[in-house]
Amino acid sequence: MAGDFSNRAPWKRSACDRCRAQKLRCHRDSGHSTDACLRCLKSGIECVTSKARPTGRPPSRQVQPTVSVEQGDTSSSSHTTDSSPSAGGTDINSMMNFEYDLSLDNILDSIGMQHSDFIVNDNILVDISPLSSQSTSQHSVAQAQTVDPSTIQSTTSYQFNSLPSTSSMDSALPIRSDHVELLLSRLHSKLSAQLYSIRSSPWDVKGTLNLSLAHQGIGQDFENCESHPLVQVSQACTELEKLLSGLRAPASAEHTPSSFSYTPAVPPRLRTTQLLIALSCYIQIVSIYGIIFSKVFDYLLSTSKTSIGSYQSSPLTLYIGGLPIPPNETLSGNLLVHLIEHQLHQIEQLMGLPEHYRVSSRAKDTKDGELGLFGSQHSQSLLNAAIQLGEDRDGNHDDIRCVRALKVVMRQIKDF
């Protein structure tokens, strides 16, 4: 028999597993082929000699299990070798390993990527399989949880009632990643249509500087009045701010003075599509504000300072701390600039944009940009690549130039 080593001659016996693995000569005492070899005796381990294995290279991508041999496992190892298929038979393990080779992790490893590049966070990532089976039940629950916007009381935060309804009433709770990406795509489509409309269609520039007093709930006065580009882009800013806050991890977040922003200890890993859509929405908002402020500055230049306040329907008296503010012709323009700077600051803080990509200025002692969505090294590389790609295209809008142009025209309105 091939496995009976006692009947073999010393020069025909098989080497032990340890010597065969190290490709060394297996020395034993002459006439005692069944004893342990000298190398195993010197190392103080058990000398195990298995049956001869088939020659040749093993199949490609076959997972070789690691076998650890201990004292008292000789019977179990021999039983395993006896039940193994012969050299000419079919290997069942190789058939089982075929499904393992088709896993997503092996495919991503072969192309140099990781599965974490496509996920946002383990806390807010939702599996796709239960969504398909529970789509009808979730739809009915979402309808039951829908809140009438008219019942919402006015708050101190700057927001509008035209935001898309979500299943969660608390803005601090995270939105599911697939919902965030869908809502960002819808917002991007609305901003593209608004950018085209504000460039091609005429609109009331004088109404942009019109001061009014509102005693109603927040957002109700805008719903009744005629749609204005400034109101539309302000609603888009608030919606983008809420969506960006939904991408932050609430477990390790600390509440900041902003209504929506949270500061996590470690920035979450986002999908590339989410980062690019959010960046494109921000660039479109900056472009729309750049067109609005350019028209406003041209209007201020064409109108004398003495007649700037003549378009007000009724004289308004503003008070700070009970003291009236003296009337100023350029007060409305300065208030508008500061309001938009504060609004963009909230978005830029959530996105974590560097200083040269921001419209608003931040304090030097803060590090909000490092904790935003573009705070990681991977996101910073993606941001630089996207901005450089936008600069190299012919006939398209220059992203850096629109940020600089908006900063310049806002500074001109302040100094007017």
UniProtKB/Swiss-Prot annotation:
**Biotechnological and industrial applications of this entry:** Fusaric acid is phytotoxic to plants such as cotton and banana. It has been shown to induce programmed cell death in plants. In addition to a mild toxicity to animals, fusaric acid exhibits acanthamoebicidal, antioomycete, and antimycobacterial activities.
Q: Report the locations given in the UniProt record.
A: Nucleus
Q: Which GO terms describe its biological process?
A: nitrogen catabolite activation of transcription from RNA polymerase II promoter
Q: Where is the composition biased (Low complexity)?
A: 74-86
Q: Where is the composition biased (Polar residues)?
A: 61-73
Q: Specify the DNA-binding region ranges.
A: 16-47
| One Gene Ontology CC term in the entry | nucleus
Give the start-end ranges of region Disordered: 50-92
Q: Which domain of life is it from?
A: Eukaryota
Q: Does the keyword Nucleus apply?
A: yes
Q: What happens when the gene is disrupted?
A: Impairs the production of fusaric acid.
For whether the record's keyword set contains Nucleotidyltransferase, the answer is no
SUPFAM superfamilies reported in the protein's UniProt record: Zn2/Cys6 DNA-binding domain
Q: What keywords are assigned to this protein?
A: Nucleus
The record's PANTHER family line, in alphabetical order, gives:
GLUCOSE TRANSPORT TRANSCRIPTION REGULATOR RGT1-RELATED-RELATED, TRANSCRIPTIONAL ACTIVATOR PROTEIN DAL81
Task: Name the job this protein performs.
Answer: Transcription factor that regulates the expression of the gene cluster that mediates the biosynthesis of fusaric acid, a mycotoxin with low to moderate toxicity to animals and humans, but with high phytotoxic properties.
Q: What is this protein called?
A: Fusaric acid cluster transcription factor FUB10
Question: Can you name the source organism?
Answer: Fusarium oxysporum f. sp. lycopersici (strain 4287 / CBS 123668 / FGSC 9935 / NRRL 34936) (Fusarium vascular wilt of tomato)
